[in-house]
From Swiss-Prot:
Gene Ontology BP annotations: chaeta development; compound eye development; positive regulation of wound healing; wing disc development; wound healing
Residue span(s) of domain GYF: 260-316
Biased composition annotated in UniProt, kind: Basic and acidic residues: 12-24, 109-124
Phenotypic effect of disruption: Embryonic lethal. Embryonic wound healing defects. The few adult escapers show subtle rough eye phenotype and extra and/or misplaced or missing macrochaetae on the scutellum.
Taxonomic source organism: Drosophila melanogaster (Fruit fly)
The protein, known as: CD2 antigen cytoplasmic tail-binding protein 2 homolog
PROSITE patterns with a match to the protein in the record: GYF (PS50829)
Pfam families listed in its UniProt record: GYF
Gene3D superfamilies (UniProt xref): 3.30.1490.40
Length: 319
């Protein structure tokens, strides 16, 4: 009798568990789905028909069919992309993440300062920062009276208005809009000036102020080094004689002692590109106008000494 009762009890449990998975429960699940997601029929204002061309203009009916193919709307009207059709950047497929993780120089957040210093040391010498060159390139995108921020806004308005599906297709095809490319280039130039010189107001600088800076600051001016005379050349004696005559004539001229001091500087201690020479008045003016917000490394022209930070130099003493 006891075994019979146990059998009846287990049979009853099986029947109850079977009742939970019926057609009625499936209908309840579908009702929940309809409550969470909007169907095409729930969206009002949609137009039927197919796209057609009128007077060389493509006219498409106003509906959400293309959007519903790529995703769905929830009950609150928010759009969600289908995960299985999520757009991915093609270049990510070519990256060997396992190899990157095993590299010795992989980025370690705990060694942030060491990583940043290593990047500065490994930065190629040929990629020297040139302030005047950056400013001249920025002016090419700008118009008179515009600030850098206004130029970016103007270029942004000139970009074509595309649907989400059109943007995805262009991204997959590798098509880049010219105006988008100009915005990226101008932003990159402005950010480089901001990070190298500390000029936080670069996006508020006008077309005229940038032109004035270009006229005031030469691009790449290095102190000229006299060419060495090759003692094994055929014309060595002639060049040496001319050189001695020039030096003797210069020494015979009355010496006009000028106490004017000129300066040369570079943006960072590791920089190989030297700017200058500049007068003391100009260096003082730039310092008073807070042009060198983070300071630059300065030394007197003609002195083969180390560069020192401009924040510790009082240019008033040399006037």
């Amino acid at each position: 009798m006891a075994s019979k009762r146990k059998h009846q009890a287990s049979q009853k449990v099986k029947e109850e568990s079977f009742k939970k998975h019926t057609l009625d429960s499936d209908e309840e699940d579908s009702d929940d789905y309809e409550r969470e997601y909007l169907n095409d029929s729930d969206i009002e204002g949609g137009e039927e028909g197919v796209a057609k061309v009128e007077d060389d203009v493509k006219v498409t009916p106003f509906n959400m069919k293309e959007e519903l193919e790529e995703g769905h709307f929830d009950k609150d009207g928010h759009y969600h992309w289908n995960k299985e059709t999520e757009a991915k950047d093609n270049w990510l497929d070519n990256i060997d993440w396992v190899k990157i993780g095993t590299q010795k120089n992989a980025f370690d957040p705990a060694k942030d300062e060491e990583n940043s210093s290593d990047e500065e040391k490994n930065e190629p010498v040929g990629k020297a920062f040139n302030l005047s060159m950056n400013l001249m390139k920025m002016v090419e995108f700008m118009k008179p009276g515009e600030t850098v921020k206004m130029t970016l806004q103007r270029l942004g308005k000139q970009r074509p208005v595309l649907t989400t599906l059109q943007r995805i297709k262009q991204k997959k095809a590798g098509i880049v809009d010219p105006k988008t490319q100009e915005i990226s280039q101008l932003t990159e130039l402005a950010n480089e000036i901001l990070s190298k010189t500390g000029n936080m107001d670069i996006y508020q600088d006008t077309y005229e102020s940038i032109k004035a800076k270009i006229a005031d600051l030469p691009g790449t001016s290095k102190p000229k080094v006299a060419d060495d005379i090759d003692m094994y050349a055929d014309d060595f004696e002639t060049k040496e004689l001319e050189r001695s005559k020039t030096s003797s004539s210069d020494s015979s001229k009355p010496t006009t002692t000028t106490s004017e001091v000129t300066w040369e500087f570079k943006w960072s201690q590791d920089e190989t590109d030297i700017q200058g020479p500049f007068s003391t008045e100009k260096m003082l003016k730039w310092s008073q106008e807070n042009y060198f917000k983070n300071g630059v490394y300065v030394r007197k022209c003609g002195e083969n000494t180390n560069f020192y930070t401009s924040n510790r130099i009082d240019f008033d003493l040399y006037l």
